[in-house]
């Protein structure tokens, strides 16, 4: 995998990683609320 360094960094404890590991069940059973004021 050739992912951006930020994704690789949060996916591994050690530095220098170039892959991203994602758990398929991550986020399961959660709710998200998005509030947008429309002002920018």
From Swiss-Prot:
The keyword DNA repair does not apply. Keywords: Hydrolase, Protease, Prothrombin activator, Serine protease. Its EC number is 3.4.21.-. It comes from the Eukaryota. PROSITE patterns: SUBTILASE. GO terms for molecular function: peptidase activator activity; serine-type endopeptidase activity. Strongly inhibited by antipain and PMSF. Inhibited by benzamidine and aprotinin by 80% and 17% respectively. GO terms for biological process: proteolysis. Residues 4-40 form the Peptidase S8 domain. The keyword Protease applies. The active site is at residue 36. Optimum pH is 8.0. Retains over 50% of its activity after treatment for 20 minutes between pH 7.0 and 11.0. Inactivated by treatment at pH 13.0 and at pH values less than 5.0. Optimum temperature is 55 degrees Celsius. Stable from 25 to 40 degrees Celsius. Activity is reduced considerably by incubation above 40 degrees Celsius for 20 min. InterPro entries: Peptidase_S8/S53_dom_sf (IPR036852). Homodimer. Belongs to the peptidase S8 family. Subtilisin-like serine protease. Cleaves prothrombin at 155-Arg-|-Ser-156, 45-Thr-|-Ala-46 and 316-Tyr-|-Ile-317 to produce meizothrombin(desF1)-like molecules. Degrades fibrinogen. Inhibits plasma coagulation. This is Subtilisin-like serine protease AS-E1. It comes from Acremonium sp.
């Amino acid at each position: 995998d050739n992912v951006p360094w930020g994704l690789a960094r949060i996916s591994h404890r050690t530095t220098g990683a170039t892959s991203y590991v994602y758990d398929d069940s991550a986020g399961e059973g959660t709710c998200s609320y998005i509030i947008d004021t429309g002002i920018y």
